[in-house]
């Protein structure tokens, strides 16, 4: 089976990430993963240059994409596939966006002024595959749970950083609305993470579009890895 990390943050682009691109790629290669999706916090979230007024929108996008571009360059050397994704944010409610690239974001600065639901619908119309990340996460900075079932294709029903209750509610949400199910680690610290989650397939992914198509077709299996016990637990077939 070919395992993939679908939700990963790297330093320096994500302000809260603790490990570099190289450190992450080497970690995932060493534990047998076939690939990772780098999904750093976008300009509307915990992006390292979010409040840098000296940078234009275009400059911020170029910096934002720099971690992924580094990953692309390192991929062959390290021996792991690297794919591009984005994590959008709205008051602590987050969305994983796959299928749009650097040129697209450079061409659409207007997204920064859009209402979030309009932004998600626009991205969908442009070919994006969108997953609501950890929809039932509760934190002090999140005023209340917000659901966007009409604006997303899928739900992250296993987030390795959350507990059973929050993930179970996410799974119910996906089932109630007939949305795709995904899993991811939301990893900010590479090998320091105590638990991982992802999606595995019988054959390797060709590209991001292939990932989206397979998930929408119900292919792939969600898994978790409990690193505290060095055990692997298959959570969904």
PLM feature spans:
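Short, solvent-exposed loop/turn segments at secondary-structure boundaries
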Residues: 14-19, 107-110
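Mobile, glycine- and charge-enriched loop segments
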Residues: 1-16, 120-127
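A short helix->loop->beta-strand "cap" motif at the edges of active sites that frequently abuts
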Residues: 33, 80, 177-179
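Ser/Thr-glycine-rich phosphate-binding loops at phosphate-binding pockets of nucleotides
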Residues: 10-11, 35-40, 44
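Charged catalytic cores and adjacent phosphate/nucleic-acid-binding surfaces used
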Residues: 1-6, 10-11, 21-26, 91-104, ...
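Extended substrate/RNA-proximal surfaces in nucleic-acid metabolism proteins
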Residues: 42-156, 161-162, 216, 220-224
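Active-site flanking residues adjacent to catalytic metal/cofactor-binding acidic residues
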Residues: 6, 39, 86, 133, ...
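Catalytic domains of carbohydrate-active enzymes, especially glycoside hydrolases
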Residues: 23-39
């Amino acid at each position: 089976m070919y395992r993939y990390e679908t939700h990963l943050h790297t330093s320096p682009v994500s302000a809260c990430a603790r490990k570099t691109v190289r450190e992450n790629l080497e970690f995932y290669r060493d534990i047998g993963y076939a690939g990772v999706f780098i999904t750093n916090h976008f300009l509307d979230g915990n992006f390292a240059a979010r409040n840098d007024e000296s940078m234009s929108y275009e400059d911020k996008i170029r910096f934002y994409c720099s971690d992924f571009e580094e990953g692309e360059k390192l991929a062959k050397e390290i021996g792991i596939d690297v794919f591009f994704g984005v994590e959008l944010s709205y008051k602590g409610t987050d969305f994983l966006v796959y299928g749009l690239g650097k040129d697209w974001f450079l061409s659409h600065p207007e997204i920064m002024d859009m209402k979030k639901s309009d932004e998600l619908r626009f991205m969908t119309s442009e070919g994006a595959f969108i997953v609501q990340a950890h929809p039932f996460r509760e934190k002090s900075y999140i005023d209340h749970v917000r659901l966007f079932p009409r604006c997303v294709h899928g739900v992250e029903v296993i987030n390795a950083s959350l507990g059973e209750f929050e993930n179970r509610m996410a799974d119910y949400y996906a089932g109630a609305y007939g949305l795709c199910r995904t899993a991811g680690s939301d990893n900010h610290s590479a090998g320091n993470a105590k638990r991982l989650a992802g999606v595995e397939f019988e054959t390797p992914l060709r590209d991001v579009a292939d990932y989206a198509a397979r998930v929408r077709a119900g292919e792939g299996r969600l898994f978790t890895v409990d690193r505290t016990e060095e055990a692997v637990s298959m959570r969904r077939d």
